[in-house]
Amino acid sequence: METQALKDFFLHDEFARQNGIELIEIEKGYARTQVRIEPRHLNAGGFVQGGVLFTLADLAFAAATNSHGTLTVTSTANITFVRGANSGIITAQAQELVNHHHLPFCEVRVTDDSGNLLAIFTASGYRKEGIYAIVENNG
């Protein structure tokens, strides 16, 4: 599957785009996303709102599991927040641990720009047989 075609596919994730979340890197079973923290991302306590971290991790999960070409949707997701952040660039790195033909499983580590772990996100998906994330141009 072409990397640029996959990145283009995820440009249609309007929610992530509206929140400043970008897909930086994608390979088979792996993806990296980032967001530069702005005042709009902070909660009343002055820390990055948990929903921002969840969305960042969820996009990384989606990219990693869809990297094989078959449309994959999230079936379950869990996030554990371990540290707060209030500035800088936050990165989520997703690694597919189980590449099952219907039920993939992935771990996503969310870190700040100093490498501090902020959250761990795990999710399983469901691959929609016969539905493809992108259509390759064969000439």
State where each predicted segment sits.
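Terminal targeting signals and extreme-terminal segments of soluble enzymes
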Residues: M1-G139
